[in-house]
């Protein structure tokens, strides 16, 4: 088990549908740490859901809010943070994540993303007739950024959230 001194912040990055929120909750529970989801914090602070923020402020307005939330949360101690899929597009966010905790990239396939997100109406970037093409374009843009910022990479395709959380804990303990 990780000691209190070893309980640095754990930041989860990766595409939508990779399991960041679900795995993050398992990690936080098992490590007795506090869990945050940056999208949920944005919704709490604005009093509106992410789709509304996108509709009213556009992606740019959303990203400004996201930068503020990530700046605030990464200054906490002993937390698990599930970031939004596009958070790594901001160089500021990448710098803060790298400097203030251990970054784990949760990797998944486009097929798994489609399966996990197809009924989710809370994903503004997928409200399109061509979600596969959107996910492929996002992967081409963002995957190199996830790799750049991450200390560890874990594939989430065919494993339960609990198994992935245990893998991450084992990796951190070996550190």
Curated annotation (Swiss-Prot):
ATP binds at residues 17-22, 123, 159. Its EC number is 2.7.1.71. It is an enzyme of class 2 (transferase). Mg(2+) binds at residue 21. Pfam families: SKI (PF01202). Its main location: cytoplasm. Substrate binds at residues 39, 63, 85, 142. The keyword Protease does not apply. One of its GO terms (cellular component) is cytosol. Keywords: Amino-acid biosynthesis, Aromatic amino acid biosynthesis, ATP-binding, Cytoplasm, Kinase, Magnesium, Metal-binding, Nucleotide-binding, Transferase. Binds 1 Mg(2+) ion per subunit. GO terms for molecular function: ATP binding; magnesium ion binding; shikimate kinase activity. Pathway: Metabolic intermediate biosynthesis; chorismate biosynthesis; chorismate from D-erythrose 4-phosphate and phosphoenolpyruvate: step 5/7. CDD domains: SK. The keyword DNA-binding does not apply. GO terms for biological process: amino acid biosynthetic process; aromatic amino acid family biosynthetic process; chorismate biosynthetic process. Signal peptide: none annotated. InterPro entries: P-loop_NTPase (IPR027417), Shikimate/glucono_kinase (IPR031322), Shikimate_kinase/TSH1 (IPR000623), Shikimate_kinase_CS (IPR023000). Its cofactor is Mg(2+). HAMAP family: Shikimate_kinase. Monomer. Catalyzes the specific phosphorylation of the 3-hydroxyl group of shikimic acid using ATP as a cosubstrate. This is Shikimate kinase.
């Amino acid at each position: 088990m990780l000691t209190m001194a070893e309980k640095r912040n754990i930041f989860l990055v990766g595409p939508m549908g990779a399991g960041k929120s679900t795995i993050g909750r398992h990690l936080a529970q098992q490590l007795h740490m506090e869990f945050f989801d940056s999208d949920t914090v944005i919704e709490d602070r604005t009093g509106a859901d992410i789709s509304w923020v996108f509709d009213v402020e556009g992606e740019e307005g959303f990203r400004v809010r996201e930068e503020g939330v990530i700046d605030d949360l990464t200054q906490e101690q002993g937390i698990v943070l599930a970031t939004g899929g596009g958070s790594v597009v901001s160089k500021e966010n990448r710098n803060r994540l790298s400097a203030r905790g251990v970054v784990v990239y949760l990797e998944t396939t486009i097929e798994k993303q489609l399966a996990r997100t197809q009924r989710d109406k809370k994903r503004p970037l997928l409200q399109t007739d061509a979600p596969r093409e959107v996910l492929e374009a996002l992967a081409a843009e963002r995957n190199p950024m996830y790799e750049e910022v991450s200390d560890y990479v874990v594939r989430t395709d065919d494993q339960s959230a609990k198994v992935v959380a245990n893998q991450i804990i084992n990796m951190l303990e070996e550190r």
